[in-house]
Amino acid sequence: MHNISAKKFLGYLKNKCLEFGVKVIEGNPAYTSIKCPNCGSRLSQLYKLADERALPSRLMYCFDCGFYADRDTVAVFNLIKRFTGLYPFSPKSNEPIAEGTVFPDEAMG
């Protein structure tokens, strides 16, 4: 399945859902990875240090509540909240951030 396009996969998924009587809800994923699913604030992208340079990572961080996660995970959380009104599980905002992570203001200054 790793060689098929997203459109083909969605078609396959819709057919399987129809076969088993599962309702499919499609939504617009635009901007779902920049809003904190925990408090609703705008997220900032974290940076990693590599060879004296700050490179963008996939981690998104909320300076208001301390939530952080991979940007794809953030998008999934926000889509679940949008369509169900439920948060998938409690964020672990008190866990330590990965070693070598640099916050945006540290990377730019």
From Swiss-Prot:
Instruction: Report the InterPro entries cross-referenced here.
Output: Cas12f1-like_TNB
Q: What is the similarity comment for this entry? A: Belongs to the transposase 35 family.
Q: Which Gene Ontology BP annotations are present?
A: DNA recombination; transposition
Locate the residues binding Zn(2+).
C36, C39, C62, C65
| The name this protein goes by in its record | Putative transposase MJ0856.1
One Pfam family from the record = Cas12f1-like_TNB
Molecular function via GO: DNA binding; metal ion binding
Q: What's in the keyword line of the UniProt record?
A: DNA recombination, DNA-binding, Metal-binding, Transposable element, Transposition, Zinc
Signal sequence bounds: none
| The keyword Ribosomal protein appears for this protein | no
Origin: domain of life: Archaea
